[in-house]
Amino acid sequence: MKKTSLFFFLISLSFYQLKAQIVIDNNAPYDNPSWMVDNVLLGGGVTTSNHSYQGDSVQIGWFDATNTDLGINSGIVMCTGDIYELDPNVVPGFVGVQNTVTDPDLLTVANSVPGMIGQTFSVTSINNVAILEFDFIPTSDSLRFRYVFGSQEYFTYENTQYNDVFGFFLSGPGIAG
């Protein structure tokens, strides 16, 4: 009987798959958006200036997702709430960040959503915004940006006026596309 029980226990473990978990940090130096742009976001061959961050300090930090299914091993994380809510070891619950940050480009993106989902509403404001801006000059003729966008609210507010949006805006001479 013991051998049979042990056999079935070992067989059941063979179907168990271990997954790594994302690590979130916004302690120094990850609490400094300028440092993170220069040392985490951008690789070599880029000169940066005019760093600015708008939002609450709990909305930005660093993540390590090595050995997860996220698709990016590590980088900068920005969130509409507290970034620590993304950590699976934190008790779930949304902690919204109430700030007065707004951006006309993000509002335009938000207003493009209704037509894409077959709706006719108008978005009049954006909330819980985090904006990281900087100027950069690359030493080469191309630039690559990898990102993952996620929404905790997607299934709750699908096809409504409450949509999470993301924008990556480039401007300057010679920008095409």
Give the predicted meaning of each segment.
Residues 1-24:
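Bacterial Sec-dependent N-terminal signal peptides
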